[in-house]
Regions:
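Signal for well-folded cores of large energy- and translation-related assemblies
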Residues: 106, 151-154, 171, 184, ...
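C-terminal effector/interaction modules appended to NTPase cores
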Residues: 11-86, 91-92, 183-190, 194-328
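Helical mechanochemical/support elements of P-loop NTPase systems and associated helical scaffolds
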Residues: 73, 97-101, 122, 142, ...
Length: 328
């Protein structure tokens, strides 16, 4: 057998495996503070209250998500942070919204990140704002070194049972239901039969795309587009989970190991309403008990014990993050 033929076969095998997702790795960043710097890193894609940018570099697909609906709304901030493994925090002003972003990052225990600031930001004041929070642990860089340091960051993956969190869903003519989301655990393969939660609907993965390329499987933490059979777009919502049967909990009441935010000064009372963020889910709830803290939801929530639930009061004129805690 000729050497040329062997080399051809090797190139074909590597290409096939790269395209099928075996060698394609992924990194997801959230860009906070001065969000428009994300445009320098990747090409703009989906735009809603979350804006996504992406770029493929050799065998790594990098995605940057910005909470473009924030600060008008608090909800996209939590959702954008929950979509990322790493944080890029480029501070351009020291106001209550910067404080809110620091509290959100600390609440969600996002301790892997890079911190920079514009020249007009008082560094000592910024340092006092982040003192005692996860942001204090971030790598501090000058803004001109941001990209250089970001390029050193390595992908994080796991081999847990497959799980995907949905962030967008729509109908495509000739294709059907298309779901955009992030593989948070394990790998998802073409023709997998999985469940959509909290509805409990059976879905089959018809096809998978990563960065507009068809692939046979996608490995955590890949961002993917899935064509699915079994669910209509109006049955799918942001925050829904696609996973194997019996690997997640679906309940209408949860108990938290709760810590109230020291910045939220108003008392909480039984039967008071709130919004709760778990992953990408934002659901209306009431305090059914204060000690221990229990929440009752209008619609069931998907979770695993240990997931962080963040309680929000969007109408608050000061801090909109009331408190948080892992779900028991």
């Amino acid at each position: 057998v000729s050497l040329v033929f062997i080399l051809y076969c090797l190139v074909w095998f590597l290409h096939r495996n790269t395209v099928s997702g075996l060698l394609v790795k992924s990194i997801n960043f959230v860009v906070l503070g001065k969000q428009d710097i994300a445009a320098e890193f990747g090409k703009k894609g989906t735009v809603t209250d979350l804006t996504l940018y992406d770029r493929k570099e050799s065998d790594i697909i990098k995605t940057w998500v910005t909470p473009s609906g924030f600060p008008d709304k608090i909800q996209p901030l939590l959702q954008a942070i929950n979509l990322a493994e790493y944080v890029i925090f480029h501070v351009d002003k020291l106001d209550k919204f910067t404080g809110e972003q620091i509290i959100a990052l600390d609440t969600l225990k996002k301790d892997k990140g890079i911190l920079s600031h514009t020249f007009d930001v008082d560094e000592s004041k910024l340092n006092s704002m982040i003192k005692g929070t996860v942001v204090e642990k971030y790598l501090k860089v000058n803004q001109d070194k941001l990209k250089e340091e970001m390029d050193k960051i390595q992908p994080i993956s796991n081999n847990d049972p497959p799980k995907l969190v949905v962030d967008h869903c729509f109908d495509v003519k000739g294709v059907g239901t298309v779901i955009l989301g992030k593989v948070t655990n394990g790998k998802i393969k073409q023709y997998d039969n999985l469940k959509l939660y909290p509805a409990g609907i059976d879905v089959m993965i018809k096809s998978i795309q990563m960065h507009d390329d068809p692939v046979e499987e996608s490995v955590c933490p890949a961002r993917v587009g899935l064509a699915v059979k079994g669910a209509k777009p109006d049955e799918v919502g942001r925050g829904d989970i696609i996973a194997q049967a019996n690997t997640v909990n679906v309940k209408s009441e949860i108990e938290l190991d709760f810590t109230k935010s020291p910045f939220y000064k108003t008392d909480i009372a039984q039967n008071q309403g709130c919004l709760v963020s778990v992953g990408l889910q934002i659901k209306a709830a009431k305090f059914s008990s204060i000690t221990p803290l229990k929440l009752t939801f209008e619609k069931p929530i998907v979770y695993k014990p240990g997931d962080i639930a963040v309680i929000l009061k969007p109408e608050s004129t000061t801090i909109r993050i009331l408190g948080s805690g892992p779900i028991k």
